[in-house]
């Protein structure tokens, strides 16, 4: 099969490029290895995190209204219902992207693309063999994936990356977030508002490294009251699975602790 334009990757970069090219009159084939369009942002990043942060914010606002003399009972968290609602939000948006692709006559092919020549790809499909496409032009928008840190890869289901954390399989009694960047703080906030005792460890001397310090100060003040602890200038030097939890070794200004 021949495609004038092939776009590899159905995330925000890929589908936007495919839609614009189609609007300009090109025949477009969009290859995405996931079963749905949207990429990391929509499927396991920005959208699910903001959906869960909305839940956390509502819980926080109900609690903070006590200062105004308005009292609500402690919330009862139905984690299965929260997870289901998050997936419905994702499903609605991915369904919308599929309709937009259809309206523009963008051919969406599900599978993993492999270059076999300078203008040829083979798309390997999980249950349907493979297809070969030649093309005139190709846009690479293959995205990224979480980097795995070998020292933290101890084979324990208790150690999660952001993708696993967004699955919201359960809400642990306690949670350590390694990294005080925006992803770590988002996940920490969600789990803290849902009932976990959350601690954050950050290697540098402040949360959100690289962000404007005038913005970080009020944020730090807010999350300090939400989190169990915030350890700055602290490095995680080891993790150990101890059965009913994970033992963590820190190296900070006061030396090494466990």
Language model regions located:
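Glycine-rich Rossmann-fold phosphate-binding loop(s) that bind the pyrophosphate
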Residues: 9-12, 35, 178-181
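N-terminal Rossmann-like FAD-binding beta1-loop-alpha1 element of flavoenzymes
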Residues: 3-30, 184-193
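Intrinsically disordered, low-complexity N-terminal regions enriched in serine/proline/glycine
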Residues: 14, 132-137, 181, 190
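Glycine-rich flavin
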Residues: 1-3, 19-171, 204-208, 213-217, ...
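Rossmann-like NAD(P)H-binding beta-loop-alpha module
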Residues: 169-211
